[in-house]
């Protein structure tokens, strides 16, 4: 990552570009390894951002003022 704080969208764009390059299959081995390492770091960063967002949503205050646990696998009631 650069000195500037990267956003989730920027990291996802960079990760998608790395995946595209690796899927083409014409990247020299040394470059492919470097790209893979960068991709893993970006993946870790994105996962962390998503986890943080989920934690923020875990306690959603309903109109009644009650807090409920956020279940990402459950649809709306």
Swiss-Prot record:
Q: Name one Pfam family in it.
A: Exonuc_VII_S
Q: Does the keyword Hydrolase apply?
A: yes
Spell out the subcellular localization from the entry. Answer: Cytoplasm
Q: The organism sits in which domain of life?
A: Bacteria
Q: Which SUPFAM superfamilies match?
A: XseB-like (SSF116842)
**InterPro entries reported for this sequence:** Exonuc_VII_S, Exonuc_VII_ssu_sf
Q: What is its EC number?
A: 3.1.11.6
Q: Annotated Gene Ontology MF terms?
A: exodeoxyribonuclease VII activity
Catalytic activity, reaction form? Exonucleolytic cleavage in either 5'- to 3'- or 3'- to 5'-direction to yield nucleoside 5'-phosphates
Hydrolase keyword on record:
yes
One GO cellular component term: cytosol
The cross-references to Gene3D superfamilies, in alphabetical order and at most eight, read: Exonuclease VII, small subunit
Please provide the record's keywords in A-Z order.
Cytoplasm, Exonuclease, Hydrolase, Nuclease
Picking any one GO biological process from the record gives: DNA catabolic process
Q: List the disulfide bonds.
A: none
Purpose of the protein: Bidirectionally degrades single-stranded DNA into large acid-insoluble oligonucleotides, which are then degraded further into small acid-soluble oligonucleotides.
Q: Which HAMAP family match?
A: Exonuc_7_S
In the record, the note on similarity to other proteins reads: Belongs to the XseB family.
How does this protein assemble? Heterooligomer composed of large and small subunits.
Its recorded name reads: Exodeoxyribonuclease 7 small subunit
Q: Which gene encodes it?
A: xseB
